[in-house]
């Protein structure tokens, strides 16, 4: 392990906004990517003994993680509210947006340091979509920089390759056809095109041999194969029954 003190690394479960597109019901405000919605997610996480919430794509613009922040989201307020409830906050970022698709520059460390000082617990870094030398080198640099500032990482679009043994602040890898695919699963002749239950018991042997796998589980609605439908803002999982 290349991190001398790992006591700050706290794995945990996450309440995920993107799964149902922030589609809250029974609230007295307009749900969406805004501060009241994420406070509700923090409440949910606290009530259900989850450790984190994630603020997914949309909290910032595509060009800057420092300046182009959504005016509907007050990160400092959410961090303070989360601290009261014992809930940490993870922010989404695309790999290219954060790094430019390569080495870690001083500007990248400035972003990581800025949000670490704010009280953010880590980043979900998305859309690597490659595992060549550039991506692997970038991942190692990101892990070291994040560890320096006590930040966790969840890497999406990248399969595990063992780096978490050197940098255990990397908690997960998503390089898998996860449950989110049920949001847009094609329906053919009245049934889903793919057999999710069969895949679910096969995927661990394809992806988890050398590290963890972020399948993004958590569907609260489960349907039989004949009743399954892909509904983006009210998604469901597929069960084994016909």
Where are these regions (language model features)?
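Conserved structural scaffold segments of CAZyme catalytic domains across common CAZy folds
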Residues: 1-86
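Catalytic cores of secreted or luminal carbohydrate-active enzymes
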Residues: 239-242
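Aromatic- and carboxylate-enriched substrate-binding clefts and catalytic-loop regions
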Residues: 56-237
